[in-house]
Amino acid sequence: MSLIFLRFAFASIFLLPFFMSQKKKIKLAKKDLPKLIAVGVFAITLNISLFFEGLKRTTAIDASMLSLTLPMFSVLFGWWFLKEKIYFVNLAGIFLGFLGALVIIGIPQIFTGTISREAFFGNILIILASIAWVIGAIIAKPLLSKYSSLVVTGIIFVVGAITMSLPSAVEYFNNPAWMNQITILGLFGLTYMILLSSISAYFLFEWGLSKTSVIVADLFQYIEPFVATVLAVLILGERISHSFLFGAVLIAIGVFMGTLAKKEIHHRSRFHKH
């Protein structure tokens, strides 16, 4: 929790000069403030907290592949809340992806007793982290037509830092010596998380979201789990099980069908939210 706090606290500080230079141009409507706070709570506080807590309990391979369900949640939530179009093939893909997620989460292994409760709970937390991210993106979408991507990014960083300050303080008082254990390599890692993983990544996502739909914006994140899986095997020495491969194939096909369907092929199978 302390790492999350430091990450977004320093990211907020880095963005402070921009806000100071643009403060006369930035006019926030009072009615939008609760929405911006909600984006920060869902997209940062809940998303990252749930993901890291889940990662403590499960493998990096399972966590990375389960995060691939994010585009499928984007399809459902984008259709339901933003009235984005959805087709029959999308629903079929979501169903396949859901089955794949159940396999990786460990539903079959529960009945055979080959998965621990801790790992199962960790996998559930990873799924909840994806849902939290999509909810944040759904709330942010209409706000990006009013405010610049950098403004939205800066505000949610501040929200993330504030909401993580209390658990970070508790963690520090329980183990005040942890800061003395930070190495030079650790400082480089924190700098990377602040400048690239936080400021650059969140800004580019919010900017991309302002130019396209929630579905398309989240679609590009499906490359990440496959890269993470390869690194987990090479660096962490984790093993890929047969059930993981089966679930991963189902999710990959599900994401493809759920998000990459061509309008001209499926125009007769269109669904609309009433």
Mark where each language-model region is.
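Hydrophobic alpha-helical transmembrane segments of multi-pass integral membrane proteins
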Residues: 1-17, 38, 92-103, 120-125, ...
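Residues that define the loop-to-transmembrane-helix transition and helix capping
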Residues: 1-2, 34, 61, 87, ...
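Hydrophobic/aromatic residues within transmembrane alpha-helices
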Residues: 3, 7, 54, 80-82, ...
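Alpha-helical transmembrane segments of compact multi-pass small-molecule transporters, enriched
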Residues: 9-14, 66-80, 95, 159-163, ...
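Hydrophobic transmembrane alpha-helices of multi-pass small-molecule transport proteins
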Residues: 15, 37, 86-109, 130, ...
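Specific transmembrane alpha-helical segments of multi-pass solute transporters/efflux pumps
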Residues: 20-67, 103, 194-212
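Hydrophobic/small/kink-forming positions within alpha-helical transmembrane segments
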Residues: 40-45, 49, 71-76, 131-134, ...
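Intrinsic disorder in cytosolic terminal tails and internal cytosolic loops
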Residues: 263-274
